[in-house]
Amino acid sequence: MATLHVLRVFCDEAGGFGNPLGVFLDGAEVPPERRQAVAHELGFSETVFVDDRSTAAMRIFTPGLELPFAGHPSVGTAWLLAHEGESVEVLRPPAGEVAVRREGERDDGLTFVSARAEWSPPWQLIEYDEPAAVAALDGPPGGREDEIYLWAWEDEAAGRVRSRCYSLADGVGEDEATGSAAIMLAEATGRELLIRQGEGSLLRARPLGDGWAEVGGGVVLAEVRDHPA
């Protein structure tokens, strides 16, 4: 059996909502050849396997494929390592080094990661005129199966955005909170953003220049349980 931490990443101010994430802090508990199957069994939009806690070397799997980088797994893993007492300032997924910073108390504050927008999956950013139209979606428009991120300004002057995200092809369906797409949107708009995605998750994102952007938010530990390796 392997120890699985289940987090909710990008929670709102009250600790609600957030995108579920599975993290195995000791990647050696799950053989590399089993990781894709384990991610499929769990069914989270992403599952993380930390291969070395001291260097924060990590791998990220959706139910259908491995990703070189993803936002909510990076934020969640950074938070969990800090929660477990690890002083990690950089994560190391396959895409490259991801800087970590924190605001506020260790568990109750906000966790941020910085990455290049080009590391993100190829989300298509589709702007809507009205946030109500985004909120009313009951699935990807036209039954599209590609990776789409639908968004509208709630308050453009204040940088407030309403969004939804779908990725049917890799088995995710609707993604409750998508850090990599938030990074792309911040880089594309050149704006500091507060994004309300899915049912009510909150993401904070801002461009850093030269193709880099930062995304962060609140994280809650939902449960710890054993899972067959």
Each PLM stretch: what is its role?
Residues 1-229:
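Active-site proximal loop and beta-alpha junction motif in alpha/beta enzyme cores
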